[in-house]
Amino acid sequence: MLEVDKINVRYGKNRKNALINVSISVNGGKVAIVGPNGSGKTTLLKAVAGLTRLDSGSIRLFGRDITTIYNELRISTNLPDVYRLMRMNTEDTIRLYSELKKQEPEEILNLVEEMDLSDTLDKMLYELSTGQQKMICNLLSLSSSSKLILLDEPFESIDLRRRINLTELITNHSAEIIMNTHEFDVLTKLKGWSLYFIMEGRLFGKFEASEVKNLYINKGVVPNNIFIMETGYGTFSISRDQGEVSVSAARNFNSLLNEVT
């Protein structure tokens, strides 16, 4: 369904690398990509969604080159850029989006009510708090008609109760999903998901997400490592069952790097 082949993305006047030779294939599964802030996670999703221009490489979606695809309704995302284009309140945005996706708006409106977000319906997206906006975009992306869902930091600024409910919605969804996060606590709940690390625009992996409790990160190269990551922070290696710092013990990728460095 999705084939990303050696894509490179650069930005700014200095043409700084955002993604470097990134390749990933998703066909009938779900993928979690974990990395620190500024590692290229969001850029990758924007590239797949057609919101970021590639400098080289290719992306094929549903068997077609992404540059030839327009108005593809089988893909959805929680990236707010998509919904901010609609200058209308939250309820009208949900109704229009549902019409485009050929589904009943009540499917999303019922979830909004279950998440205690009904007071957001008469407000514009930009008027919502960070957590409210994130949650509404999450619910919009989790349309039952979607075949590929791109989730960028779906748990960011979300309270514990909603995080639990959201995790259930995501893990039970039938679509293929690519989810970016810098948090580790959710990974052990993603049984059957593939896991990749991303640092400085380079993708490393893959593992089973539920295996994260057995993974360790080490400064430098250690014997019997699974793979080595060469980064601007230094050289790191990932090992299984023993090592310097347990990946699952860290709250998020940023704190993990602080511990190991």
Regions found by a protein language model. Give the residues of each.
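Catalytic Walker B motif of ABC-type/P-loop ATPase nucleotide-binding domains
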Residues: 149-153, 158
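The feature captures the beta-strand-to-loop junction immediately N-terminal to the Walker
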Residues: 34-36
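A short, flexible loop at the N-terminus of ABC-type nucleotide-binding domains that lies
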Residues: 1-23, 27
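Q-loop/switch helix immediately C-terminal to the Walker
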Residues: 77-102
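Conserved ABC transporter NBD signature motif
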Residues: 57-71
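H-loop/switch region of ABC-family ATPase nucleotide-binding domains
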Residues: 180-184
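Helix-to-loop junction immediately C-terminal to a conserved catalytic motif
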Residues: 49
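Conserved ABC ATPase "signature" region
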Residues: 105-121, 142
